[in-house]
C-alpha cells in the first residue's frame, strides 16, 4: 500500500516537485503549449529554465580584441506555477504526486497517467 505525501510548506515556500531533466509543458504565458526539458531549477525562488522556452535576445557590444558585436538568444527563467509535468507517452500534462512504496522509497508519479518519473 503506497502512502501519498501532500505538499508541505517549509520556510514560507512550497517544495518544487519538478526536477532538472523533467519534460514539462508551459500552461500559461506567451509560450503556452510549448514542451521542453528543464535545464536548471532555482527552488528558493520557485523558478526554472526550460530548453527552448521563454527566449530572450541580448545585444552584445564588440570587445576591444577585434571581435564584432553579436545578438545572443538564451532561455530566461519561468515561474514553476506556469508549468506542468508532461507525459511523452500519453501526450498529456499532469500534476506530480509523491508516493512512498512498501519499502519506504519515495517516488514521483504523474497523477493522470500513473507514470513513474525517474
From Swiss-Prot:
It is found in: Plastid, Organellar chromatophore. GO terms for biological process: translation. The keyword Plastid applies. One of its GO terms (molecular function) is rRNA binding. The keyword RNA-binding applies. InterPro entries: KOW (IPR005824), Rib_uL2_dom2 (IPR014722), Ribosomal_uL24 (IPR003256), Ribosomal_uL24_CS (IPR005825), Ribosomal_uL24_KOW (IPR041988), Translation_prot_SH3-like_sf (IPR008991). GO terms for cellular component: organellar chromatophore; plastid; ribonucleoprotein complex; ribosome. Gene3D superfamilies: 2.30.30.30. Keywords: Organellar chromatophore, Plastid, Ribonucleoprotein, Ribosomal protein, RNA-binding, rRNA-binding. It comes from the Eukaryota. Its main location: plastid. Disulfide bonds: none annotated. It holds the Pfam family ribosomal_L24. Part of the 50S ribosomal subunit. Belongs to the universal ribosomal protein uL24 family. One of two assembly initiator proteins, it binds directly to the 5'-end of the 23S rRNA, where it nucleates assembly of the 50S subunit. This is Large ribosomal subunit protein uL24c. It comes from Paulinella chromatophora. The lineage of its organism: Eukaryota, Sar, Rhizaria, Cercozoa, Imbricatea. The gene is rpl24.
Amino acid at each position: 500500500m503506497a502512502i501519498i505525501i501532500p505538499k508541505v510548506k517549509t520556510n514560507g515556500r512550497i517544495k518544487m516537485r519538478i526536477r532538472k531533466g523533467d519534460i514539462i509543458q508551459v500552461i500559461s504565458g506567451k509560450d503556452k503549449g510549448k514542451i521542453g526539458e528543464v535545464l536548471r531549477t532555482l527552488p528558493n525562488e520557485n523558478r526554472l529554465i526550460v530548453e527552448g522556452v521563454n527566449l530572450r535576445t541580448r545585444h552584445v557590444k564588440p570587445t576591444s580584441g577585434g571581435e564584432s558585436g553579436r545578438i545572443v538568444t538564451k532561455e530566461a527563467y519561468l515561474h514553476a506555477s506556469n508549468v506542468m509535468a508532461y507525459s511523452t507517452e500519453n501526450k498529456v500534462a499532469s500534476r506530480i504526486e509523491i508516493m512512498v512504496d512498501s519499502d519506504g522509497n519515495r517516488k514521483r508519479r504523474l497523477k493522470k497517467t500513473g507514470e513513474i518519473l525517474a
